[in-house]
Structure formats: structure tokens, C-alpha cells
Amino acid sequence: MAEASSANLGSGCEEKRHEGSSSESVPPGTTISRVKLLDTMVDTFLQKLVAAGSYQRFTDCYKCFYQLQPAMTQQIYDKFIAQLQTSIREEISDIKEEGNLEAVLNALDKIVEEGKVRKEPAWRPSGIPEKDLHSVMAPYFLQQRDTLRRHVQKQEAENQQLADAVLAGRRQVEELQLQVQAQQQAWQALHREQRELVAVLREPE
């Protein structure tokens, strides 16, 4: 029974492999996207993994249990293989999402396609290291300089806004101080007038 199950599993893998190869067949010269190649590599890996962990090897590891419960052993093996494939596919999907691999691979495909239709000759070293280094590094440093300059200008503008806000706050404080002084002087003048009025009222006739 183990041999029959192993044979059935192997034939199933072979059928899937032939189906995959027929569906994945493309005309010569056709470029396959890197995302498609990655998915094909994952499928091939899973097929080889299932082939390496055949049912025959599984039953060899659990001979006693297989002799007692052959049907249960088959069910456990099928469930184990299915969960293993699902777990691997989910892990690879998480890696693709975390690394944004599909976007990166599609960008690489786009760069390659643009390079095919590019008319100007590709860059080649001149044989003079200093010249080659300058031609490569100079644009990079110029770009970095422009980036830093924009950051500096942005920071200066923010600093100027903060300085203007501080000056406006100082003016408000000064105005409040003047208002307080004016109110204090007015209160003192009113207090003097009240005292003078009280003194006048207390004078004998």
C-alpha cells in the first residue's frame, strides 16, 4: 500500500510538473518577468521538496504506526505536506511584502527593457581610473550638494519663521507690559484722588 501511495504521489507530482511546464512554456526569445520566475522557482522548490519527502520515506520513519494505522498514516502525511507547502508559501509571501520584491523586480524588468531600446552606447570604462571615478562620482556629489542645499534652505526658512514668531511674541509681551504699566499708573492716580477726596471730606468746617 505504501508503494502504491508513493507511486500515486509521484505520478501526481509528475502530472503537475508536466502541466506546469506546458502552461509556463513560452515562445523562444520571449522575456519572462522576474516575478514570474520567482514564483516558478518557488513551485519547483516545493515539487522537489515533496519528492524528497516521499510517502515511502515517511512510512519508513514510522513503521510501527504505519503497520497499525496505514490509512491514518496516509492522512497524516497528506496533511503534513499540505501544511508544509502552505507555510512555505505564506513565509515567502511575507518576505515579498516586507521587501517590496514585486515592485523591485518589476523595476528591474523595466530597466532591462529600456536598455534594449536605448540608442546611445552603454557606458564603458575609458582605461583612466581617475577619469572614470570622476565621471561616476561627480554627478553623485553634485546631487548630494543640491539635496543638502535644499535642506539648508528649508531649515533657514523654518528658522526665519521661528525668529519672526519670537519677535512677534516679544512685541506682544512689551505691549502687555505697557498696558500693565498704564493700568498701574491709572490705578495709582485714582488712589491718590480718592485719598485727597477723603482728606478734604475729613477737614473741619
From Swiss-Prot:
Expression sites (tissue/organ): Highest levels of expression in heart and skeletal muscle, with significant levels expressed in kidney and liver.
Coiled coil regions in record: 141-193
Region (Disordered): 1-30
Cellular location(s): Nucleus; Chromosome, Centromere, Kinetochore
UniProt entry keywords in alphabetical sequence: Activator, Cell cycle, Cell division, Centromere, Chromosome, Chromosome partition, Coiled coil, Kinetochore, Mitosis, Nucleus, Transcription, Transcription regulation
Cystine connections: none
Keyword Cell cycle: yes
Pfam name, any one: Nnf1
Induction (free text): By polyamine analogs in analog-sensitive H157 cells.
One Gene Ontology term from the biological process aspect of the record: transcription by RNA polymerase II
GO MF annotation, one: transcription coactivator activity
Cellular component annotations (GO), alphabetically ordered: cytosol; Golgi apparatus; intracellular membrane-bounded organelle; kinetochore; MIS12/MIND type complex; nucleoplasm; nucleus; outer kinetochore
Task of the protein: Part of the MIS12 complex which is required for normal chromosome alignment and segregation and kinetochore formation during mitosis. May act as a cotranscription partner of NFE2L2 involved in regulation of polyamine-induced transcription of SSAT.
Quaternary structure note: Component of the MIS12 complex composed of MIS12, DSN1, NSL1 and PMF1. Interacts with COPS7A. Interacts via its coiled-coil domain with the leucine-zipper domain of NFE2L2. The interaction with NFE2L2 is required for the transcriptional regulation of SSAT.
Protein name per UniProt: Polyamine-modulated factor 1
